[in-house]
Amino acid sequence: MEKVTIAAFGGSLRSKSYNGYLLKTASKNVPEGVDFKIAPIRNLPMYNTDEEENPSEAVVNFKNVLRDADGILVVTPEYNYSIPGFIKNAIDIASRPYSDNVLKGKHVAVMSASIGAFGGMRAQYHLRQVFVYLDMKQINKPEVFINFAQDKFDPNGELRDEKSLLLIQELMKKLAAECRLSRKSLPV
């Protein structure tokens, strides 16, 4: 089986966030033959076009992890019915300048967790709009919205909900499979 690389970013800036736990859960549930890497976002500066020609080390490292990946996983909280600023900032950095958009054409999957009833779905829908513009290949199903996350993760961040775990595993399998198919269709 050909090895593929999936790079992930997101979670939350908060140390004990449910989305951080979700990112950790996804990392433990990748199918065989997947190299899973975290693209570091904590030290990214705010996106500024003035800095495109001389990016910081944090920007270079972040973009290189994404550039080298076959697929991308974004794990997002929902703030005020939308995408948190740090997630949008990371996407802006990864996609600019347009001549160095490391997201274009990549397969992408998204997951979210929330203490509310909707599990972050509104943030996911906004992300999906952004992904269309960036010409990313979205894995649309299964949708992984973990609602009432406080009841589904234990105090150590371990996911206790079997249905959610199965959805995560299925989404990771689909993302990996689509990445493999794309590799096979590339001209030699």
Positions of PLM-derived features:
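Glycine-rich phosphate/pyrophosphate-binding loop and the adjoining helix
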Residues: 7, 137-188
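Short connector loops at secondary-structure junctions
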Residues: 37-45, 144-150
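A generic structural motif
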Residues: 31-37, 136-137
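Secondary-structure boundary/capping motif
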Residues: 15-18, 47, 82-83, 119-120
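N-terminal beta-loop-helix "entrance" segment that forms/cooperates
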Residues: 41-57, 153
